[in-house]
């Protein structure tokens, strides 16, 4: 298959590109490199630098006889969605509408969309099924839900003259290698790892008893690849998480232990809670098990160890790059 991956230079997208190429697919990548890194994209992919919110940029990638689109590109920071809501709206909603417009123009048979756990309310039952009410409490969650509705409504249009098969993945807290270590606005595990590597205090916002459902990147990629040609996923929404909860306090302790520290010898501080922070999060992954045949295989302990090994190496590489640039 010829597959376009938007956001393919980013954390999740680049791992998906790697797997697709290994399985023999031809992959087209588009990324604006706002948070993605060009070096994440394997040599076997056709690369376009551009913004999904610019339909002309996007159409360059669409003109490659595509069989499917994996739309992952987006603004993914809850905090930045509050400080810059128009950018959040432009990237997540307008960008998705642009993807849909071109899917219609080119009669795209298949679209997979990266939705988010943030569309659920803090009062959702635990574990949370896909049928739970969607009442996002952050601007980011609002834009992800709006984009998801655009995707599903477009696929259900009675005036379409072709089969447009879509699947939406509500992804939980994805972690693993290539996660940002220097972005204080997204990815709590990456933030904590970056803090440790730079010798900075770990900051927990709120009381730390809020929970997250952490799922390893390899498991996420397996779900996406499996869904591409599986009719049971057409027109469906799936939660992608581990099905387990971990408090932010527990996460802090795990990360400290990974670096042979405890709270007694490393600074861990608390700060006021931030807006848009869901209190308790846990995915019900029954539908993914039944219809996708998917099961997360990587335990948090194993995934954390792999991520820490990568982070230590990446931090060293980044330091060497900075030193080399200063010497020029």
Describe the residue ranges of each PLM region.
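N-terminal Rossmann-like NAD(P)+-binding domain of SDR-like oxidoreductases, especially those catalyzing
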Residues: 1-174, 313-314, 325-328
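Residue-level signal for the nucleotide or nucleotide-sugar donor/cofactor binding architecture
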Residues: 53, 83, 91-94, 131, ...
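A conserved pocket-lining segment of Rossmann-fold NAD(P)-dependent short-chain dehydrogenase/reductase
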Residues: 81, 132, 161, 166, ...
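Active-site "substrate specificity/gating" loop of NAD(P)-dependent dehydrogenases
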Residues: 122-123, 139, 180, 184, ...
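Hydrophobic alpha-helix immediately C-terminal to the catalytic Tyr-X-X-X-Lys motif of short-chain
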Residues: 146, 150, 154, 188, ...
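C-terminal substrate-binding subdomain of Rossmann-fold SDR/epimerase-dehydratase oxidoreductases
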Residues: 197-328
């Amino acid at each position: 298959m010829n597959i376009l991956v938007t956001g393919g230079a980013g954390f999740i997208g680049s791992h998906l590109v790697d797997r697709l190429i290994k399985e023999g697919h031809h992959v087209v990548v588009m990324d604006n490199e706002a948070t993605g890194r060009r070096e994440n994209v394997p040599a076997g992919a056709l690369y376009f630098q551009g913004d999904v919110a610019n339909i002309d940029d996007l159409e360059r990638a669409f003109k490659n006889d595509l069989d499917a689109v994996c739309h992952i590109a987006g603004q993914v920071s809850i905090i930045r969605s509050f400080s810059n809501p128009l950018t959040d709206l432009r990237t997540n909603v307008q960008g998705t509408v642009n993807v849909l417009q071109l899917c219609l123009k080119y009669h795209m048979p298949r679209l997979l969309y990266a939705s988010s756990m943030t569309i659920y309310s803090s009062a959702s039952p635990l574990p949370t099924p896909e049928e739970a009410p969607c009442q996002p409490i952050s601007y980011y969650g609002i834009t992800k839900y709006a984009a998801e509705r655009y995707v599903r409504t477009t696929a259900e249009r009675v005036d379409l003259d072709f089969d447009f098969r879509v699947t939406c993945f509500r992804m939980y807290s994805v972690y693993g290698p290539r996660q940002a270590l220097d972005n204080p606005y997204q990815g709590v595990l990456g933030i904590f790892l970056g803090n440790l590597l730079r010798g900075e205090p770990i900051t927990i916002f709120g009381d730390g008893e809020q929970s997250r459902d952490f799922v390893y990147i390899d498991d996420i990629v397996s779900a996406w690849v499996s869904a591409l040609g599986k009719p049971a996923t057409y027109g469906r929404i799936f939660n992608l998480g581990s099905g387990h909860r971990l408090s932010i306090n527990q996460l802090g302790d795990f990360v400290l232990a990974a670096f042979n520290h405890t709270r007694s010898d490393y600074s861990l501080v608390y700060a006021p809670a931030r807006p848009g922070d869901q209190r308790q999060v846990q995915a019900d992954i029954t539908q993914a098990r039944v219809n996708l045949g998917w099961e997360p295989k990587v335990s948090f302990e194993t995934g954390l160890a792999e991520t820490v090994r990568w982070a230590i190496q990446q931090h060293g590489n980044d330091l060497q790059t900075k030193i080399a640039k200063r010497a020029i």
